[in-house]
Amino acid sequence: MFMRIIISVLLCLSCLTAMTCCGSKIEIYDDVSHYREYMSFDSEGTDSKWNKWGMDESIWPRQISDVSQVSDYKMIYYNPWDAQYLGYLVIDYSDDDYASEIDRLKNYPSTDYIGYYSVQKEETYELLAVNAHQYLGFVYALTDGKNRIVYAEQIFCNYFMDIDYEKYIRTDYLLDGFNAKVDNPYRKQMMNE
């Protein structure tokens, strides 16, 4: 009986170790030709790793019609215990496409965002649309006013990101004041620490 308990405990520990090792690799995707594979557009109602906690990503373009307009792209997935996503897409639009996309984004029902994760009023770029959640993070679009639109997202839970996000995304693509580090003040406030 005692031996069975020890074997059971060892098996449980082995499984936990395997889960931790297998699920903790940061996955980086930068081939824009596979863009839709990493978006939640097609994973609604499914148990896909790309469902992104149900956050609405419709701010991002549903498809990219001209890959040559994309100047930068990166999507990161990390799941040490809970899934986390960090991504950005930078598109330099033609004048007509830019005007059309600006119109689409300005009609998006943006949410309040100021105060979540120390975010302040966006002043680095013009904020075109934002979907903010006090627990899950942000999906948004910014513009420099010169035909360039930056789509970005930081989606996570537990009030912090395990990803060293500043290593993977330009800080000017983050909303002004964004702080989702382990010891961020917003987390302390929400956890009553």
Language-model segment annotations:
Residues 17-21:
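C-terminal motif of bacterial Sec signal peptides marking the signal peptidase cleavage site
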